[in-house]
Amino acid sequence: MSNKEQLIEMQGKVDEVLPDSRFRVVLENGHTLIAYSGGKMRKHRIRVLAGDTVSLEMSPYDLTKGRITFRHLEPRAGGAPRRPSPHRR
């Protein structure tokens, strides 16, 4: 996946969390593929759970693998607001 112009961007839902930080994702069109977290998501420790809606990039040469680039936030159904994460120094 070296050339950005050739990447295919899709959205899907995480169906299952697999070992080694991989995920089984079902795309909007019904196809299932294996995806991994992108580098910035690992760097900033963005956690992806089963049921999350994600954006991912795929190579046109191998449509069975993808890279998760964004986790979409679902609106919360009432309750308490989100707590800010504790700051570490």
UniProtKB/Swiss-Prot annotation:
It is found in: Cytoplasm. Its main location: cytoplasm. Gene3D superfamilies: Nucleic acid-binding proteins (2.40.50.140). One of its GO terms (cellular component) is cytosol. Keywords: Cytoplasm, Initiation factor, Protein biosynthesis, RNA-binding, rRNA-binding. PROSITE patterns: S1_IF1_TYPE (PS50832). It holds the Pfam family eIF-1a. Residues 1-73 form the S1-like domain. GO terms for molecular function: ribosome binding; rRNA binding; translation initiation factor activity. One of the essential components for the initiation of protein synthesis. Stabilizes the binding of IF-2 and IF-3 on the 30S subunit to which N-formylmethionyl-tRNA(fMet) subsequently binds. Helps modulate mRNA selection, yielding the 30S pre-initiation complex (PIC). Upon addition of the 50S ribosomal subunit IF-1, IF-2 and IF-3 are released leaving the mature 70S translation initiation complex. NCBIfam families: infA. Belongs to the IF-1 family. Component of the 30S ribosomal translation pre-initiation complex which assembles on the 30S ribosome in the order IF-2 and IF-3, IF-1 and N-formylmethionyl-tRNA(fMet); mRNA recruitment can occur at any time during PIC assembly. This is Translation initiation factor IF-1 1. It comes from Acidovorax sp. (strain JS42).
